Design a protein with these regions (language model features):
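Conserved pre-motif I regulatory segment
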Residues: 16-50
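Short, conserved phosphate/pyrophosphate- and ester-handling motifs at nucleotide-, phospho-/glycolipid
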Residues: 32, 86, 280
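ASCE P-loop NTPase helicase motor core
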Residues: 36-37, 41, 46-237
């Protein structure tokens, strides 16, 4: 009987891996193959409180491998839940996995009743059982009490408690150690295997993707990202130099050519696929004003079709909607309709109808226009 069970498990492993490879679409690199074997050991292991940690640099095929694994699990009728720390990260996760994804906060927290304090959230009940929870961009998961309105104040503690409170649930953390850790720490605690093992008593399975995929080798963006990562690992940076020639995905343009180049990108690829990255909010405001006036020909500061990002958790405007506990910092909203304007206490507001990524219903809210031109990440209390 033991030999039969062992043989059966080997056959299941091989079958599962074969389907993942078909969905992946390429031959596995050595580190991808090692990651696949480690995941299979985790998946079919018997340890009830085990966790899988998948780390990988840009261009190593991490997202493609995760997407293939997730969709293979679904084909095997295994329950999965996809999560990410921010609304934008959840949108990206959903995009490459072709499955719904949610923010961690919206999945694990529930608002307390009015007597206990408006805007105070406790850890919710986990109704999932026999489920694998995949969390992308895990480097952003903090342990500090940055927002005491949520649970214990430690997102990592609450996430692990929530997942393993459900029967036979397990967690897969996905991230890149080269990305910035949470504010106030030098490393990302959610990506440190030894820390997870000691702090939570978990059985940790770990894989690290380091091989750059062949189809990514000609990418100038990945070349420079790898170069910067190697420079950081070598010690303090004396001077940061980028190589911008000889790559199909990098075009160097002067300031005088930028508007024309942006206009062409908007027409060819769409606004969602065209972004300007700035070093400060001050410069972002200048680019925003120039693009709106000279490319989009939008005279108003705020109008229908605009995309805005929420910069502070809001517990008020979602209260009247059944499926919206709160509107989270980092959520992306599209302005569907603009209503009346109002000035109050020296600030400028507009009433708007908004659709927020991840929710089916639109909401009505007053939007503070001053944040659109603020040079800070959010308005200060002053």
């Amino acid at each position: 009987t033991a030999h039969f069970c062992l043989l059966n498990l080997v056959m299941i492993n091989e079958h599962f891996e074969r389907i993942v490879k078909e969905k992946f679409g390429f031959d596995f690199s050595p580190t991808q193959q090692a990651a696949m074997q480690s995941f299979l050991t985790f998946l079919f292991g018997r340890h009830p409180e085990s966790l899988f940690l998948l780390k990988g640099y840009a261009g190593t095929g991490k997202t493609s491998l995760v997407a293939a694994i997730v969709n293979t699990l679904l084909q095997f009728e295994q329950q999965v839940v996809l999560l990410a720390p921010t609304g934008r990260a959840a949108k990206v996760f959903a995009g490459y996995s072709h499955q719904p994804a949610f923010t961690i906060h919206k999945k694990i927290y529930r608002q307390k009743n009015a007597q206990e304090g408006i805007g105070i959230f406790s850890l919710g009940f986990n109704g999932n059982a026999n489920t694998l929870f995949f969390v992308d961009e895990a480097s952003m998961i903090s342990m500090g009490s940055q927002d005491s309105n949520f649970g214990s104040g430690s997102l990592l503690d609450d996430l692990i408690e929530f997942v393993y409170n459900g029967r036979n649930n397990r967690l897969v953390l996905i991230g890149d150690t080269a990305q910035l850790p949470p504010i106030g720490v030098d490393v990302s605690p959610a990506l440190e295997a030894e820390f997870l093992r000691v702090s939570y008593g978990m059985e940790i399975y770990e894989a690290n993707l380091t091989d750059i995929m062949r189809q990514s080798e000609q990418s100038g963006i990945l070349y420079n990202a790898t170069r910067v990562r190697e420079m950081i690992g070598a010690g303090p940076l004396a001077k940061l130099l980028f190589r911008v020639t000889g790559f199909p995905d990098i075009v160097r343009v002067s300031g005088g050519e930028l508007l024309e180049e942006l206009d062409q990108c908007y027409n060819s690829f769409g606004m969602d696929e065209t972004m300007v990255i700035c070093r400060s909010n001050k410069r972002a405001n200048r680019f925003n004003e120039g693009i709106r006036a000279r490319i989009l020909y939008r005279e108003e500061a705020f109008g229908g079709g605009d995309k805005i990002m929420v910069v502070k958790n809001n517990y008020f405007w979602g209260a009247e909607y059944d499926k919206i506990d709160f509107i989270a910092n980092g959520d992306i909203a599209t302005v569907e309709k603009v209503g009346k304007y109002k000035d109050l206490y020296g600030f400028h507001f507009v009433h708007a109808r908004l659709s927020i990524y991840g929710y089916e219903e639109e909401i009505s809210a007053w939007v503070m226009l001053d944040t659109l031109t603020s040079e800070q990440t959010a308005l200060s209390y002053d």
